Amino acid sequence: MNGTEGPNFYVPFSNKTGVVRSPFEEPQYYLAEPWQFSCLAAYMFMLIVLGFPINFLTLYVTIQHKKLRTPLNYILLNLAIADLFMVFGGFTTTLYTSLHGYFVFGPTGCDLEGFFATLGGEIALWSLVVLAIERYIVVCKPMSNFRFGENHAIMGVAFTWVMALACAAPPLVGWSRYIPEGMQCSCGIDYYTLKPEVNNESFVIYMFVVHFTIPMVVIFFCYGQLVFTVKEAAAQQQESATTQKAEKEVTRMVIIMVIAFLICWLPYAGVAFYIFTHQGSNFGPILMTLPAFFAKTSAVYNPVIYIMLNKQFRTCMLTTLCCGKIPLGDDEASATASKTETSQVAPA
């Protein structure tokens, strides 16, 4: 083994020289220079400064404008709530621990930080699954008389939380565990050891199959069918121009969210899978730190994509920020929004 395993941690550094200390008790400056820990803290501060206002604004604008309370937007709001959980439950903790160079909150704090980070990421993933299924039903129409309504959206939101909790909660009750990872300032699932006492191997396999592979298969199936249907409908002109435009814009927004999710989370998942399948291999703390911290940007990019690509929401947001006045040049966006609002598709 090229790392050092303790009762509730695994440090990716050999203790042959006797320098390894518990990441819950002393700074880990033998893993990286102090300035590198400061860079992590600065990065987390940036995510907090960006993540809180933009997600809070998403919630506030939707509450202020009744026309935004559509079934599809329920799922998008669910993402904003999950992102706020990550900001308050995870980012603030990681900022503080990075400034100190070790996880000062102890094993219990590690459990909480790891739980919120995992919960937020899984809610985002399962929300994308629900959005993909919604797009598939609306555009491909496998059930001709089905209309995605408020009750379906609420069930979709509940489903995302149930599945996310099914992934994030087991390590809190003895199936696997949360431990500090990388430079030991943030916590995640234990991919580093088999730890038979907590059946770690079976949980990691369960997580990769049920909470990563299956969602990805569903998402790619839905969008594969969707792309084919959109091309076929465009060729046959089966829908009105307004409806086609609305469906394409909403679909484009959701596809971009999926791509952004993959860009942020695939490096983390790939490195975690490599470490798990190569137990005892030599890897440095930076190898897991960079993808783990990069994955946290998911709390920022979803609302940014939503605001940039959803004309109706953008107009409502600017109206809220400008104290009820529609800014000059947004009349066209407002008109477009009012047209697409009546479509079977959610506003875009």
Curated annotation (Swiss-Prot):
Location of the protein in the cell: Membrane; Cell projection, Cilium, Photoreceptor outer segment
Stretches in topological domain Extracellular: 1-36, 97-110, 174-202, 275-286
InterPro entries in UniProt: GPCR_opsins, GPCR_Rhodpsn, GPCR_Rhodpsn_7TM, Opsin, Retinal_BS, Rhodopsin, Rhodopsin_N
Name of protein: Rhodopsin
Family of this protein: Belongs to the G-protein coupled receptor 1 family. Opsin subfamily.
SUPFAM superfamilies (alphabetical): Family A G protein-coupled receptor-like
Disulfide bonds: C110-C187
Sites bearing N6-(retinylidene)lysine, chain numbering: K296
Site (Plays an important role in the conformation switch to the active conformation): E113
Motif ('Ionic lock' involved in activated form stabilization): 134-136
Principal location: membrane
Lipid attachment locations (S-palmitoyl cysteine): C322, C323
Subunit details: Homodimer. May form a complex composed of RHO, GRK1 and RCVRN in a Ca(2+)-dependent manner; RCVRN prevents the interaction between GRK1 and RHO. Interacts with GRK1. Interacts (phosphorylated form) with SAG. Interacts with GNAT1. Interacts with GNAT3. SAG and G-proteins compete for a common binding site. Interacts with PRCD; the interaction promotes PRCD stability. Forms a complex with ASAP1 and ARF4. Forms a complex with ASAP1, RAB11A, Rabin8/RAB3IP, ARF4 and RAB11FIP3; the complex regulates Golgi-to-cilia rhodopsin/RHO transport in photoreceptors.
Keywords: Acetylation, Cell projection, Chromophore, Disulfide bond, G-protein coupled receptor, Glycoprotein, Lipoprotein, Membrane, Metal-binding, Palmitate, Phosphoprotein, Photoreceptor protein, Receptor, Retinal protein, Sensory transduction, Transducer, Transmembrane, Transmembrane helix, Vision, Zinc
TM spans (from-to): 37-61, 74-96, 111-133, 153-173, 203-224, 253-274, 287-308
Mod. after translation: Phosphorylated on some or all of the serine and threonine residues present in the C-terminal region. Contains one covalently linked retinal chromophore. Upon light absorption, the covalently bound 11-cis-retinal is converted to all-trans-retinal. After hydrolysis of the Schiff base and release of the covalently bound all-trans-retinal, active rhodopsin is regenerated by binding of a fresh molecule of 11-cis-retinal.
Cytoplasmic side of membrane: 62-73, 134-152, 225-252, 309-348
Organism lineage string: Eukaryota, Metazoa, Chordata, Craniata, Vertebrata
Domain of life: Eukaryota
Function, in words: Photoreceptor required for image-forming vision at low light intensity. Required for photoreceptor cell viability after birth. Light-induced isomerization of 11-cis to all-trans retinal triggers a conformational change that activates signaling via G-proteins. Subsequent receptor phosphorylation mediates displacement of the bound G-protein alpha subunit by the arrestin SAG and terminates signaling.
Gene expressing this chain: RHO
Keyword Metal-binding: yes
Source species of the chain: Caluromys philander
